[in-house]
Amino acid sequence: MPNIKQSKLDSLLRAAEVSCAENGARLTQRRRQVLSELMQSSSPLSAYEVLDLCNRSTTSAMPAMSVYRILDFLEQQLLVHRLSTSNKYVSCAHIACDHKHFQATHFLLCEGCSSVEEVDATEEASEALEQMAKTVGVKLTPQQVELSGICTTCQNSASGGV
């Protein structure tokens, strides 16, 4: 969510607070700060990158262990996702959504600029993957799918904007 307007950021953070409250949890100031940094980032961030950004914007240093605990909390609350391939984090693109999403999360990762798009897979696509696994005797468990490629912006840059 790069170049996010302050009003949109505030709205998403309010939605995150409501979501936490519905789950009997609190979005504390530090949790809010970590989530805000992830929402404003144009690419996935490691825990130490989050720590660095948080410590730049405050006078009291946040310990690294706190960032790890906060990221774990935010992941449990379904507000952020950890990308398995890079061990980095992105904010959930569906924080303010009021509709259902499939259990498995799907990400399109750009190899050029490191941008990440969270996408909804169709039920048909999920069923096709389950059927493919079933033919070789594997029962799939819900998990996220990470696919790498080149985004439109990078494709246009590589071809000289043509």
Give a label for each model feature.
Residues S46-S60:
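DNA-recognition alpha helix
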Residues R32-E37:
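Pre-recognition alpha-helix immediately N-terminal to the DNA-recognition helix
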Residues Q76-V162:
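Non-DNA-binding regulatory cores of transcription-related proteins
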Residues D10-G24:
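Short, Lys/Arg-enriched N-terminal segment that forms or immediately precedes the first helix
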Residues N23-A25, M39-S42, S57-T58:
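Short helix-capping/hinge SLiMs at alpha-helix to coil transitions
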Residues V67-Q77:
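Basic amphipathic alpha-helical segments that dock to polyanions
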Residues L27-R30:
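Short helix-coil-helix linker/hinge
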